[in-house]
């Protein structure tokens, strides 16, 4: 997660084992802790006897599962938000679980099926479009932060327009991000007749017509063995908290914006690479970058390219930010932000 700029996990759709929270405490991952309540098969009909969320017969079950989560996990600093459950309708039982948690704890509570009702502190829709997010953000009557509890369903090329989401999210403070559905592909390793490895899914087992979910289980941003996919790289790039902006070829300057909340940019090494038709022709350091959270600095970065390295071909310049000192899971030199700009001719 850290390597690819992920800072939050939602424990959909039930609490995780205790060791998970200890690791999140240690490594600095925000947790949206979700109660073990998921009953969308019963529908969302608010009439009594419809959705279980509004059925008094199930009130104790809702309370029990919510309180089990709270009592076990309440002392973990990584838990910053409580989630009442997932796709289980709304109604009396969730009004009660919300009020009960509020009497015990000051942390925010979210619940997707509450939509814009009162029993959620965060508006947390699923799979809202970028245009919908902007419409919400521009509506002055909307005061609750919006966090997409699920978005960018990572099947196929789902993350192909991921930047479109974050262009909007970063534009409006009321938009606070989201949780990609989901993290890891669920598949088994197998080999072809010529001994090449591949990942299987529904339809690869049993006779034709055997019930399965097809490829609906291959929807993560990493492979089943946790190796990276193209989507992983796209996610890490879009999520990066260091932005390289407004490169000026004439003055050899670039703006560097710090989107971190707590970290100064002096903990990173900055450098650039110039490529001609993909081949590296020059690299250099960008020295003495200091920018507090939320601040932007403009810096010069070229002391002149040696004459024999000058080029007039298909030229691109790449900027990088890398960790100076090793951190847990992140060796020194790990690149956590990058940008590429088309230059064409350079000097």
What are these regions (language model features)?
Residues 1-255, 259-266, 271-283:
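Extended substrate-binding grooves/exosites of carbohydrate-active enzymes
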Residues 268-314, 318-332:
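Intrinsically disordered, low-complexity Pro/Gly/Ser/Thr-rich segments with frequent PxxP/GP/PP motifs
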Residues 326-347:
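Short beta-strand elements
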